[in-house]
Swiss-Prot record:
<feature type="active site" description="Tele-phosphohistidine intermediate">
    <location>
        <position position="9"/>
    </location>
</feature>
<feature type="binding site">
    <location>
        <begin position="87"/>
        <end position="90"/>
    </location>
    <ligand>
        <name>substrate</name>
    </ligand>
</feature>
<dbReference type="GO" id="GO:0004619">
    <property type="term" value="F:phosphoglycerate mutase activity"/>
</dbReference>
<dbReference type="InterPro" id="IPR013078">
    <property type="entry name" value="His_Pase_superF_clade-1"/>
</dbReference>
<feature type="site" description="Transition state stabilizer">
    <location>
        <position position="182"/>
    </location>
</feature>
<dbReference type="InterPro" id="IPR005952">
    <property type="entry name" value="Phosphogly_mut1"/>
</dbReference>
<dbReference type="Pfam" id="PF00300">
    <property type="entry name" value="His_Phos_1"/>
</dbReference>
<feature type="binding site">
    <location>
        <position position="98"/>
    </location>
    <ligand>
        <name>substrate</name>
    </ligand>
</feature>
<feature type="active site" description="Proton donor/acceptor">
    <location>
        <position position="87"/>
    </location>
</feature>
<dbReference type="InterPro" id="IPR001345">
    <property type="entry name" value="PG/BPGM_mutase_AS"/>
</dbReference>
<feature type="binding site">
    <location>
        <position position="60"/>
    </location>
    <ligand>
        <name>substrate</name>
    </ligand>
</feature>
<dbReference type="GO" id="GO:0006096">
    <property type="term" value="P:glycolytic process"/>
</dbReference>
<comment type="pathway">
    <text>Carbohydrate degradation; glycolysis; pyruvate from D-glyceraldehyde 3-phosphate: step 3/5.</text>
</comment>
<protein>
    <recommendedName>
        <fullName>2,3-bisphosphoglycerate-dependent phosphoglycerate mutase</fullName>
        <ecNumber>5.4.2.11</ecNumber>
    </recommendedName>
</protein>
<comment type="similarity">
    <text>Belongs to the phosphoglycerate mutase family. BPG-dependent PGAM subfamily.</text>
</comment>
<feature type="binding site">
    <location>
        <begin position="8"/>
        <end position="15"/>
    </location>
    <ligand>
        <name>substrate</name>
    </ligand>
</feature>
<keyword id="KW-0413">Isomerase</keyword>
Length: 228
């Protein structure tokens, strides 16, 4: 029976500082590393054997994958990295303290940017975007596909192709697949898998560094899902 493991990265240094992160590349905090290690230990204790892993191009997700696989004695499995699993792009909000953003733009406006399904934060300027265009990890990505800002809706639109083309193919072969990614890219996958409404998905909270197990039938319909 195919099994999907969704794991949001452990707490990052910017999570700890209450900053909007998005596509900014930051490392795990000490707490985040411990969360990832604990997740790997839980997988090992529950006898879960992973066949293949998928993660984003951002360090906090890569570190989570590494710690989780090392702790579960599965470092040798193939790991595929893709920009499509990156966190939602928060545009001009990236790097801002969330409390300071609320003071500047208003509580209601920031809540709408964060929690509405199809509302994007203010877009980055060309100058702000330049650092991504020069980043080697995106050198094979058509720059026209690189976002200036994203809503959860547009995040879902870029996540679905990697599900359809790659992740689901391993599951259809009966494999156990780990996806170690980010709050919003995982939220997008959950919406897609569980057919969650636009209104309901915005209230979903994804725990950091905690394996969320999806048990699927042979047609990839959801049988059950639960946190370890």
């Amino acid at each position: 029976m195919p099994k999907l493991i969704l794991c949001r990265h452990g707490q990052s240094e910017w999570n700890a500082k209450n900053l909007f992160t998005g596509w900014e590349d930051v490392q795990l905090s000490e707490q985040g590393r411990n969360e990832a290690i604990t997740s790997g230990r839980k997988l090992k204790e529950n006898g879960i054997e992973i066949d293949v892993a998928f993660t984003s191009l951002l360090t906090r997700a890569l570190e989570t994958t590494q710690f989780l696989l090392a702790e579960s004695d599965q470092e040798w499995i193939p790991v595929h990295k893709s920009w499509r699993l990156n966190e939602r792009h928060y545009g001009k909000l990236q790097g801002l303290n969330k409390d300071e953003a609320r003071k500047e733009f208003g509580e209601e406006q920031v809540h709408q940017w964060r929690r509405s399904y199809d509302v994007k934060p203010p877009a980055q300027t060309e100058e702000q975007r330049e650092s991504y265009l020069k980043d080697r990890r995106y050198r094979h990505l058509d720059h026209r596909m690189m976002p200036y800002s994203e809503s959860l809706k547009t995040t879902l639109e870029r996540v679905v192709p990697i599900w359809t083309d790659k992740i689901s193919q391993h599951l259809l072969d009966g494999e156990t697949v780990l996806v170690a990614a980010h709050g919003n890219s995982i939220r997008a996958l959950i919406k897609y898998l569980d057919n969650v409404s636009d209104e309901d998905i915005i209230g979903y909270e994804i725990k950091t560094g905690a394996p969320l197990i999806y048990e699927l039938d042979d047609n990839l319909n959801v049988i059950d899902h639960y946190y370890l």
